[in-house]
Amino acid sequence: MPRKAGSVEEAEAGAEEVGAEEVGPEESGGEESGAEESGPEESDPEEPGAAAEMEAGQPRPVLRSVNSCEPSQVIFCNRSPRVVLPVWLNFDGEPQPYPTLPPGTGRRIHSYRGHLWLFRDAGTYDGLLVNQTELFVPSLNVDGQPIFANITLPVYTLKERCLQVVRSLVKPENYRRLDIVRSLYEDLEDHPNVRKDLERLAQEHIENQRMEGETEDFN
């Protein structure tokens, strides 16, 4: 049975890391680890829907967590002014939300090597960076030291930042009452979306692999 990223356990306050909490093991068997019951962040790749898709011959998503048995201790550090929503990509590439992180806080995560994480503004779903990139993949711990995932704001373009501010001030039903060019109505209505970002990242991953293959052939 594959390991899962679902069972969440909060440790007592006062962890050594600044404001760090602890999130319990990503185990498939809660009865083995004392984990809580499955929450919305869990997804079992052996569920009927997933099995039916595999039987239908549909390809699995490019971006998904690897079913690894190699644990990795990670500390999520929110170094942004936003409330952060950690999102785990399960073994079928489905985004699974985790408890939010207030600004300036941290949380210890019992993750696994090869699992994929990304981070979003919990209120607006604006994209955030983790260690200066969009995806975080835990590696193995060295000498028992945890891996730090530093979550920060990217440098948004002026247009992106303006759209964020307008969305925070104007209700969606009132966008088209604003005295702006029509194309900006559509931009405002095109709210940040994790699934769209995953499609873009998957295409970038495929393109990078293709370019690497062409480079190897050339050499």
UniProtKB/Swiss-Prot annotation:
Oligomer and partners: Component of the VBC (VHL-Elongin BC-CUL2) complex; this complex acts as a ubiquitin-ligase E3 and directs proteasome-dependent degradation of targeted proteins. Interacts with CUL2; this interaction is dependent on the integrity of the trimeric VBC complex. Interacts (via the beta domain) with HIF1A (via the NTAD domain); this interaction mediates degradation of HIF1A in normoxia and, in hypoxia, prevents ubiquitination and degradation of HIF1A by mediating hypoxia-induced translocation to the nucleus, a process which requires a hypoxia-dependent regulatory signal.
Lineage start = Eukaryota, Metazoa, Chordata, Craniata, Vertebrata
> Residue spans with biased composition (Low complexity)?
48-57
Q: Which InterPro entries match?
A: VHL_alpha_dom, VHL_alpha_dom_sf, VHL_beta_dom, VHL_beta_dom_sf, VHL_sf, VHL_tumour_suppress_b/a_dom
Function description: Involved in the ubiquitination and subsequent proteasomal degradation via the von Hippel-Lindau ubiquitination complex. Seems to act as a target recruitment subunit in the E3 ubiquitin ligase complex and recruits hydroxylated hypoxia-inducible factor (HIF) under normoxic conditions. Involved in transcriptional repression through interaction with HIF1A, HIF1AN and histone deacetylases. Ubiquitinates, in an oxygen-responsive manner, ADRB2. Acts as a negative regulator of mTORC1 by promoting ubiquitination and degradation of RPTOR.
Please quote what the entry notes about the protein's domains. Answer: The Elongin BC complex binding domain is also known as BC-box with the consensus [APST]-L-x(3)-C-x(3)-[AILV].
Acidic residues: which segments have biased composition?
Answer: 9-47
Which pathway does it serve? Protein modification; protein ubiquitination
The way this protein sits in the membrane is described as: Peripheral membrane protein
Q: Could you give a single Gene Ontology term from the biological process aspect?
A: proteasome-mediated ubiquitin-dependent protein catabolic process
Return the protein name: von Hippel-Lindau disease tumor suppressor
Sorted alphabetically, the keyword list is:
Cell membrane, Cytoplasm, Endoplasmic reticulum, Membrane, Nucleus, Tumor suppressor, Ubl conjugation pathway
Instruction: Respond yes or no to whether keyword Cell membrane is given for this record.
Output: yes
Q: Report whether Calcium shows up as a keyword of the record.
A: no
Task: For the region Interaction with Elongin BC complex, give the residue spans.
Answer: 157-166
Example GO CC term: the record gives: plasma membrane
State the similarity comment.
Belongs to the VHL family.
One MF term from GO for this chain? ubiquitin-like ligase-substrate adaptor activity
Localization recorded for this chain is:
Cytoplasm; Cell membrane; Endoplasmic reticulum; Nucleus
Q: Residues annotated as region Disordered?
A: 1-57
UniProt cross-references to Gene3D superfamilies, sorted A to Z = von Hippel-Lindau disease tumour suppressor, alpha domain, von Hippel-Lindau disease tumour suppressor, beta domain
